[in-house]
């Protein structure tokens, strides 16, 4: 008889290490520029290269950004922390050690709330613990000639422009269980960093990079299995696919008696699988010791209070407020808060007096489509929030129809302007005079006697035909509610 433990379903145990490039103008320990995309090796200096006689000095803006990020992740800020040297030899590391934080990070023990939308399942909220956030310097970048990878290349070059750029490494607790949860967690981290303005989170440019640690076990009470690290995922979709693949690979290995070894694997986007890269190092392999060139880091109570006061309302808080106070659906709240500029635009529209639900529909629909297709931002949109608010209030007040609004919208999106002024100038306002609509209805009924007779004979669906004719004759300007009311009365012989 099979052991009871083998009857339990497999469970994945997943944690993420998220490396966030902090958006400072200069590097973490030197004044060298952090500009992305310039000629190789144009943003290096003696400090970056670790030349004899140079001393690093902590960029105070890096400390501010790291503390703000930690606060947004509900982490406890350390009164005292320090930098350490992490020893390893690799061509993209000019000093042969990396300045990082080991046993005294800047912040520990936090959490974030993640909204998980699984396809075909109900959306659910999950709290993910965060173990720590620490500051460190980035490494350079290897460029392989003749191939995107080392394999197949003729030679490799190293670009140190990225070396010394400030990073905040955010280490989650192993609270994630699926590829979707991992992707949603990473997405929420980026969303928070963007709201704070401490990073652009551009994964294609390496501003946000994730390493995933995965193991599987039989049931939630079983000990953790052998942990495998996955690298080389440059999108949230890649994170989800890599995790899902690795879970299946490990489960299959255990079920067929193959060993699962502690190693680092790379996600191959083309082949949609993970491949072994190297054995995974432990902390002892790096021979950490306190950096003798950098003093202890202290964050004063005044600094904490000042930086906390500058924090914006964060995405999760906005989502709850939009749903609870404004009556928006979970979906609308999620879409509107995805980018801070969209959320700010929406709030300005509602503050100017427009209905929240109607405003959300226009912003997440027509406006978002225009912004995305034209590669604009909501902040740069000529159609200002108060102008959209005016248009929404015209619709909500029965002054114009949705059809008319869509007709004038392209011009407004391109040039901005007052919707009311355009409506008044072109005579596009809704016809809401009962006598005027009644006269048009009488004319229509007189022009279609056979349809009138058929309606009175029981084919009541013909009312839709008359509504269509009425709207066609009025250019969509007749008040729909009033038009239906008068049509119904007249068709019944009233």
UniProtKB/Swiss-Prot annotation:
Any idea which GO molecular function terms this record carries? asparaginyl-tRNA synthase (glutamine-hydrolyzing) activity; ATP binding; glutaminyl-tRNA synthase (glutamine-hydrolyzing) activity
UniProt cross-references to Gene3D superfamilies, sorted A to Z: 1.10.10.410, GatB domain, N-terminal subdomain (1.10.150.380)
Q: Which reaction does it catalyse?
A: L-glutamyl-tRNA(Gln) + L-glutamine + ATP + H2O = L-glutaminyl-tRNA(Gln) + L-glutamate + ADP + phosphate + H(+); L-aspartyl-tRNA(Asn) + L-glutamine + ATP + H2O = L-asparaginyl-tRNA(Asn) + L-glutamate + ADP + phosphate + 2 H(+)
Cite the InterPro entries for this sequence: Asn/Gln-tRNA_amidoTrfase_suB/E (IPR017959), Asn/Gln-tRNA_Trfase_suB/E_cat (IPR006075), Asn/Gln_amidotransferase (IPR018027), Asn/Gln_tRNA_amidoTrase-B-like (IPR003789), GatB (IPR004413), GatB_C_1 (IPR042114), GatB_Yqey_C_2 (IPR023168), Gln-tRNA_amidoTrfase_suB_CS (IPR017958)
What's this protein's family per the entry? Belongs to the GatB/GatE family. GatB subfamily.
Give the record's subunit note: Heterotrimer of A, B and C subunits.
* Protein name per UniProt: Aspartyl/glutamyl-tRNA(Asn/Gln) amidotransferase subunit B
Q: Which organism is it from?
A: Synechococcus sp. (strain CC9902)
Q: What is the lineage of its organism?
A: Bacteria, Bacillati, Cyanobacteriota, Cyanophyceae, Synechococcales
Gene encoding it? gatB
């Amino acid at each position: 008889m099979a052991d009871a433990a083998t009857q339990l379903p497999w469970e994945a145990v997943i944690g993420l290490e998220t490396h966030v490039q902090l958006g400072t103008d200069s590097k973490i320990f030197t004044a060298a520029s952090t500009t992305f995309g310039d000629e190789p090796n144009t943003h290096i200096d003696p400090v970056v290269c670790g030349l004899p006689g140079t001393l690093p000095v902590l960029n105070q803006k890096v400390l501010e950004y790291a503390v703000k990020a930690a606060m947004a992740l509900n982490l406890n800020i350390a009164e005292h922390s320090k930098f350490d040297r992490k020893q390893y030899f690799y061509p993209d590391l000019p000093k042969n050690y990396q300045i990082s934080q080991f046993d005294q990070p800047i912040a520990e023990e936090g959490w974030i709330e993640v909204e998980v939308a699984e396809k075909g399942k109900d959306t659910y909220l999950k709290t993910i613990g965060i173990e720590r956030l620490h500051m460190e310097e980035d490494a350079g970048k290897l460029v392989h000639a003749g191939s995107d990878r080392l394999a197949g290349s003729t030679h490799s070059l190293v670009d140190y422009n990225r070396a010394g750029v400030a990073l905040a490494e955010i280490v989650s607790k192993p609270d994630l269980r699926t590829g979707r949860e991992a992707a949603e967690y990473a997405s929420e981290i980026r969303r928070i960093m963007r709201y704070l303005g401490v990073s652009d989170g551009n994964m294609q440019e390496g501003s946000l990079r994730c390493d995933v640690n995965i193991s599987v076990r039989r049931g939630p009470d079983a000990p953790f299995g052998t942990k495998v690290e996955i690298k080389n995922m440059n999108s949230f979709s890649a994170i989800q696919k890599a995790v899902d693949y690795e879970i299946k690979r490990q489960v299959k290995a255990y079920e067929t008696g193959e060993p699962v070894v502690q190693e680092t694997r790379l996600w191959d986007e083309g082949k949609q699988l993970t491949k072994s890269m190297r054995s995974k190092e432990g902390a002892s392999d790096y021979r950490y010791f306190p950096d003798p060139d950098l003093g202890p880091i202290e964050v004063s109570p005044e600094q904490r209070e000042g930086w906390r006061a500058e924090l914006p309302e964060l995405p999760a808080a906005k989502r709850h407020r939009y749903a609870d106070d404004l009556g928006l659906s979970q979906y609308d709240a999620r879409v509107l808060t995805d980018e801070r500029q969209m959320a700010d635009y929406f709030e300005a529209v509602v503050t100017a007096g427009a209905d929240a639900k109607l405003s959300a529909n226009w912003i997440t629909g027509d406006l978002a489509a225009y912004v995305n297709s034209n590669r604009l931002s909501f902040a740069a949109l000529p159609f200002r929030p108060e102008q959209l608010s005016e248009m929404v209030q015209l619709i909500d007040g029965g002054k114009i129809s949705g059809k008319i609004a869509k007709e004038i919208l392209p011009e407004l999106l391109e040039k901005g302007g007052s919707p009311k002024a355009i409506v008044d100038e072109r005579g596009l306002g809704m016809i809401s005079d009962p006598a005027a609509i009644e006269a048009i209805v009488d004319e229509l009924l007189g022009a279609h006697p056979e349809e009138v007779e058929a309606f009175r004979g029981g084919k009541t669906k013909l009312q839709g035909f008359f509504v269509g004719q009425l709207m066609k004759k009025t250019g969509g300007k007749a008040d729909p509610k009033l038009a239906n009311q008068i049509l119904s009365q007249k068709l019944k012989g009233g």
